[in-house]
């Protein structure tokens, strides 16, 4: 298959996975994950910070966990279509995706925009790599992030 990106929002932190997401059962993303659970997540914030992570996703129908993580704004994504399809934690359409991270790369830009511009021009002139931030890598494909 092909790699696909989908916009999704992290849910609050909870035991059982490094990251949690909520979605509707029976969608293409659920089918894709059941076929191949390997995932890649990317985050970019304010032009400064960037995170890239890869891991294994697991689809969860655990109603206790759904109740624990439930937020009322989920109702917007699960419109009422008759009992029990009402966007509440007992709505059978709601499933969770738990992701266990195995590798991650973090970049934090520490330089201001003028310094970044200076560093880029300096790099063009000198051939040196611009110094605009720091990178941290966590990479152990055999150990979930929770165990490190």
State what each model feature region is.
Residues 1-16, 32:
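An N-terminal domain-cap segment
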Residues 1-2, 47-49, 107:
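Short glycine/serine/proline-enriched coil/turn segments at secondary-structure junctions
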Residues 5-7, 52-54, 135:
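Well-ordered beta-strand positions in beta-sheet-rich domains
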Residues 11, 42-44, 107:
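A generic structural motif
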Residues 29-101:
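Short, structured beta-strand-loop surface elements
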Residues 86-148:
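C-terminal edge-of-domain segments
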């Amino acid at each position: 298959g092909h790699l696909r990106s989908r916009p999704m929002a992290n849910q609050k932190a909870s035991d059982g996975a490094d990251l949690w997401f909520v979605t509707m059962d029976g969608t293409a993303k659920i089918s894709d994950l059941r076929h191949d659970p390997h995932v890649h997540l990317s985050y970019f914030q304010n032009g400064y910070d960037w995170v890239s992570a890869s891991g294994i996703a697991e689809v969860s129908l655990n109603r206790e966990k759904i109740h624990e993580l439930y937020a009322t704004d989920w109702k917007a994504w699960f419109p009422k279509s008759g009992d029990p399809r009402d966007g509440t934690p007992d709505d059978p359409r709601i499933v969770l995706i738990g992701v266990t991270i195995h590798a991650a790369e973090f970049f934090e830009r520490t330089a201001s925009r003028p310094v970044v511009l200076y560093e880029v021009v300096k790099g063009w002139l000198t051939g040196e790599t611009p110094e605009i931030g720091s990178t941290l890598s966590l990479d152990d494909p055999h150990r979930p992030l929770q165990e490190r």
